[in-house]
Structure formats: structure tokens, C-alpha cells
């Protein structure tokens, strides 16, 4: 017997009343007291016809079939793959409205989760919104039914790879060559054994890292080399973990970017973490250092420091700065970059900041101010261990408003800090990702 549908999929008309944190429209088709329906492709204020796609206990899900009354903030997406590819979810919303939405998500999270409100809301930071993505990972899949290789980000259904030919958010040296890259991979003997390709761009060099599950034939290696030569792209191969990455072409390459305002250059490896949006990154660093207000005569602690993205610029402006990071490879590069830039007042330590660090040597040092840039999970574990009373000011750079709100609750409502200011930063235009910065002062 054929399985019956579990719910009615009949399309219906509804009005969109809000935008969710993940970029979907919010409707209450059965009235204020009923559960919400999240509608993919809809914007606040619109009247739409939607098709139900899923039903859950606390909410339903649907997609737009037709827009009957469009929002004045609706725009035509630049990308023909929008709506299928999960790389972007907000291309149909005007750019200034995207930033306003992210600022709202940030403030609502602080109030709802953290039970805090800032004394001041900072103007949102924004930079170039197209061709900004200088690091990322494409999924690769040989599809037997299509008889060819697909290269792209995942579809909204993560089981599938979006069949894209170009990506306007990726740096043009890569984003405009996706179709050529797919053709190259399709020609390889080992096309079934390449699950992903990572890209990263420095100031002068763009690199691709080809992950392969089986050794590549000599013909495949030559094909990759020719692609690199033709398009001026460095090619790395990865047969296993991070330590297995090897340069295929050219014989030597230097991946680097420079932060001109502080005259520091960062050398990095192809799988290292760097901030995805280079233009916004420079604005963010300047903003963070200005808000921190640290100068000569002061010592600063920089947690989750990575390559030293904030640490090295700070070293130009303060007496001493200590960076702490859990990735030993990033710490090694941070130390080397400090040496290359002649910054003897920057010291780095390796530490898992989710574990007990109360006996760590850096924990026992005295500091005036704290800057931290944790991952999505936030920094609650290390915040609970720090002697917070020694910090006059804390600047917290966040990539997730929920974890920032939780940590703000701890700092303000348990430790007595004041949330002086907070603001969104549009590190990932056309996505629902919310980067932000917050300033806490000791009372």
C-alpha cells in the first residue's frame, strides 16, 4: 500500500509578518495564537501563496509559490541559482534592508536570551557585498544520472550539490570559473574520488586544495597543473587530514594578505582560517581597536586569536599583547608572522579554551583589557575561569548572536559588567549569518 501524505499540502494565501533569524518569512496563517509557519522566499509585509513542505509540532514550513503583494524591499536576485543553492538566502532582499534585519536579530537575541540591552547601538559595519568571499569549500559530486560532475555549495536539501556555473559572492578568480572547474574534474580518471575543493585567496595568490580519496593518476595531476597554469591558480592536493596537504603547482607559492593601516602581513596555509570578507575584516579590526581604546602602557589579552588577526595590529598600539588559540598550527603561524613583522611585544600560547585553563601561565598574568573572537559556540567556558575583575573593558567579536547573548547574560547579570554598546557587522552579505561586536565595561 502506498504511504499516505501525513499532512495537507494544498497551497494557501497568507501574509508575512516578520523575518526569521535564518532568513525565512514568518506567517501565522491561523491567527495570533496558532503556531508559526516559516516560509522560504518570503519577506515581511508580503501577501503570498505558499505550499506547505513540512509540519512540525511547534512550527510548520512552506515555500513561496506566488507573490501577490511584494515588499518594496524585494529585489531581483543576481544569481540564477538563488532559491536552490544554500550559499545565500537573502539575495531577494535589498542590501540595506539585510543589514537592518541583522541588527534587529542581534538586539532581539540579546533581549530574549541574554536579558540585556545595550546603552548604545552602534551603526552596522558593511563593505563590498559581491565577490567578497575569499575562503570556502565547494562540494564535488559525480552524478551518474547526469553523466557529469557537479561543483558548488550544497542545496537547501544538504543531500544534494547545487549545480552552479558561477558564484557572484566568491572572489571572481574562483567564482567565475566554477563551470570550468567542473569540466576539469569531469575529465579526471579519479572524478568519483574528489568529494570537495577548498579555495582561499591572498592579496596576490589564489589557491585550490583538491581533496582526493584515492591516489591521482599522473594524467590527472598533469590536468590539474595545466588548469593552474592557464588560470594562474595555485593547486594543492589533500589525500588525508590537514597534515597531508601538498603543493602540486607551482614549485613555490606564498599565500599572504596585508593589513595596510597597521603595516602587518599575514602568511598562511591553504586550509588555515582567515576572515572570509577581507574588506570588512579591515574595517572590523579598526572598529574593535577603536572601541577597545588600548594604548601604550597597557597589556591586552586576545582570546581565540587565530593567526593573530587582532593581535598583530594591537601590537602596533599597546605595550604588550598575548594571544591564545587552540589550533597549534595557527599559533605557529602567528608566532612566525609576529617575527616577520618585527613585533617582539606579541606573545602566543596554545590552549583549548573550552577546557580548564586556571593553571595556564597566561591566565596568571595581569592585563588591562580583553578582546575575544570565539567560534559560534561562544566563550562561556573561559569567561567563567578568567579573573574578570582585572579587565577594565572587554570587546567581544561574535559570529553567533545566540552565544553572544548567553555570554552577555553572564557578564552583565552575574559579573556586574555594563553592556555599553553593540552593533552588527555584515561579514557575509546575502546570507543570514550575523557577525557583531559588543563592548562591556567593568562597573
From Swiss-Prot:
What residues does the TRAM domain cover? 4-66
Q: Which reaction does it catalyse?
A: uridine(1939) in 23S rRNA + S-adenosyl-L-methionine = 5-methyluridine(1939) in 23S rRNA + S-adenosyl-L-homocysteine + H(+)
Which keywords belong to this entry? 4Fe-4S, Iron, Iron-sulfur, Metal-binding, Methyltransferase, rRNA processing, S-adenosyl-L-methionine, Transferase
Q: What is its EC number?
A: 2.1.1.190
Annotated GO molecular function terms are:
4 iron, 4 sulfur cluster binding; iron ion binding; RNA binding; rRNA (uridine-C5-)-methyltransferase activity
**Where do the annotations place [4Fe-4S] cluster binding?**
79, 85, 88, 167
What processes does the entry annotate via GO biological process terms?
A: rRNA base methylation
What Gene3D superfamilies does this protein map onto? 2.40.50.1070, Nucleic acid-binding proteins (2.40.50.140), Vaccinia Virus protein VP39 (3.40.50.150)
Record-linked PROSITE patterns: SAM_MT_RNA_M5U, TRAM, TRMA_1, TRMA_2
Domain of life of the source? Bacteria
Protein's UniProt keywords contain Metal-binding: yes
The record's active-site residues are 399
Entry's family note: Belongs to the class I-like SAM-binding methyltransferase superfamily. RNA M5U methyltransferase family. RlmD subfamily.
Function statement: Catalyzes the formation of 5-methyl-uridine at position 1939 (m5U1939) in 23S rRNA.
Please report the name of this protein according to its UniProt entry: 23S rRNA (uracil(1939)-C(5))-methyltransferase RlmD
* Species of origin: Xylella fastidiosa (strain 9a5c)
Amino acid at each position: 500500500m502506498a504511504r499516505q501524505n501525513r499532512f495537507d499540502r494544498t497551497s494557501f494565501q497568507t501574509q508575512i509578518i516578520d523575518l526569521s533569524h535564518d532568513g525565512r518569512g514568518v506567517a501565522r496563517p491561523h491567527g495570533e495564537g496558532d503556531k508559526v509557519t516559516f516560509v522560504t522566499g518570503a519577506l515581511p509585509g508580503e501577501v503570498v501563496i505558499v505550499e506547505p513542505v513540512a509540519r512540525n509540532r511547534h512550527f510548520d514550513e512552506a515555500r513561496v509559490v506566488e507573490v501577490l503583494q511584494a515588499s518594496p524591499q524585494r529585489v531581483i536576485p543576481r544569481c540564477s541559482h538563488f532559491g536552490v543553492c544554500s550559499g545565500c538566502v537573502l539575495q531577494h532582499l535589498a542590501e540595506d534592508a539585510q543589514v537592518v534585519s541583522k541588527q534587529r536579530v542581534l538586539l532581539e537575541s540579546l533581549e530574549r536570551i541574554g536579558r540585556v540591552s545595550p546603552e548604545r547601538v552602534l551603526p552596522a559595519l558593511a563593505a563590498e557585498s559581491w565577490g567578497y568571499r575569499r575562503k570556502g569549500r565547494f562540494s564535488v559530486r559525480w552524478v551518474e544520472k547526469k553523466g557529469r560532475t557537479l561543483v558548488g555549495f550544497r542545496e537547501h536539501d544538504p543531500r544534494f550539490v547545487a549545480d552552479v556555473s558561477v558564484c557572484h559572492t566568491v572572489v571572481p578568480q574562483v567564482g567565475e570559473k566554477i563551470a570550468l572547474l567542473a569540466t576539469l574534474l569531469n575529465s579526471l580518471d579519479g572524478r568519483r574520488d574528489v568529494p570537495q575543493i577548498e579555495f582561499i585567496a591572498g592579496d596576490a595568490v589564489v589557491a585550490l586544495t583538491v581533496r582526493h580519496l584515492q591516489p591521482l593518476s599522473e594524467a590527472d595531476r598533469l590536468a590539474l597543473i595545466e588548469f593552474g597554469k592557464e588560470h594562474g591558480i595555485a593547486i594543492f592536493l589533500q589525500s588525508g587530514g590537514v597534515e597531508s596537504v601538498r603543493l602540486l603547482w607551482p614549485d613555490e607559492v606564498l599565500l599572504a594578505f596585508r593589513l595596510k593601516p597597521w603595516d602587518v602581513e599575514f602568511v598562511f596555509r591553504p586550509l588555515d582560517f582567515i576572515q572570509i570578507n577581507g574588506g570588512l575584516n579591515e574595517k572590523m579590526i579598526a572598529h574593535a581597536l577603536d572601541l577597545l581604546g588600548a594604548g601604550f602602557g597597557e597589556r591586552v589579552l586576545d582570546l581565540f586569536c587565530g593567526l593573530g588577526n587582532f593581535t598583530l595590529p594591537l601590537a602596533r598600539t599597546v605595550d604588550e599583547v598575548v594571544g591564545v588559540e587552540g589550533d597549534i598550527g595557527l599559533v605557529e603561524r602567528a608566532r612566525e608572522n609576529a617575527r616577520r613583522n618585527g613585533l617582539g611585544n606579541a606573545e602566543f600560547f596554545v590552549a583549548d579554551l573550552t577546557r580548564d585553563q586556571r593553571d595556564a601561565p597566561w591566565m596568571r598574568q595581569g592585563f588591562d583589557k580583553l578582546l575575544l573572537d570565539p567560534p559560534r559556540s561562544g566563550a562561556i567556558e573561559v569567561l567563567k575561569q578568567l579573573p574578570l575583575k582585572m579587565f577594565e573593558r572587554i570587546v567581544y567579536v561574535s559570529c553567533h548572536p545566540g552565544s553572544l547573548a548567553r555570554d552577555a547574560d553572564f557578564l552583565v547579570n552575574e559579573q556586574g559588567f555594563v553592556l555599553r554598546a553593540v552593533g552588527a557587522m555584515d561579514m557575509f552579505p546575502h546570507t543570514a549569518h550575523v557577525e557583531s561586536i559588543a563592548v562591556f565595561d567593568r562597573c
